[in-house]
Amino acid sequence: LLLTAMLKHEDITAAPVILSTRSHGKVYSIYPLLSQYNYLVTLAMVDGNAVFMDASEPLLGYGRLPLRCYNEEARVINETANVISLSANTVAEVKHTNVYVVNEEKGNIIGSKIQTPGYYESMNLRERVKEKGKEQLLADIKKEMGTDIDVTNLELDSLNLTDEVLGVKYDFELKGEKEDIIYFNPMLGEGYKENLFKSAERAYPVEMPFTMDEVYNLQMDIPQGYVVDEIPKSMILKLNEENEGVFEYRISMSGNSISFRSRIRIGRANFQPDEYEMLREFFNYVVKKHAEQIVFKKKS
């Protein structure tokens, strides 16, 4: 209410909006009760555009709401008490990762990763850095990458620009002796390790917090003194006939280099119970493919 009052004081048209957060449950639109609502945000008209604001999240950018607010129906507190929709289907998290792996002059395998997470993942990373520091984030990245990989030179672009997504950059080096066989997972810690949809059946709708589009690209040199012994197969899996989701897994060789691409796109956030098995099997396949490895064998 204070934010709404401040905007009105500056002659900006604004009104409070009441809603029910995702954990609080849905609002019954036919017979709404005040007890069904548990959260308040502000709706302002800026240059003819409707802008939602929430003063409770200091790291939340302009015109953004916390993910917990996207729970379908909300109600504007004005003369008409009109109903508006805050649907998770309108929230898109887009993540891009590019990885480059090359052979160093001494024969070591080194690389760099450049990543732009989605907006809300960027916000979570900012909170982690604020609470625990950049060094702890580096330690967490090392843990995700694996004990046989050393991570250095972490850079965070746009850390203090809360309206922007983060830019995450770091270098890495594969440690260890040159074994006769090298097992290399091209996802380098970015893959899905387990399926979030574990239950065999579900009686309630699936309500994800956003739609998603995650693209991961890797370009690597074949390690010096090695040849490719085994390589995963490329494939494309569609979520359904309406093409509301797709999983691409593409890998190819050209000369002494390997190109790899993984893309997961889910075009809507809400699914009915009879669609649960489809969604679960889709991510089962993602987990399976993301675990596959390239096998390099030392030249004889």
Residue ranges and their predicted role:
Residues 1-300:
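A sensor for short, sequence-defined functional sites
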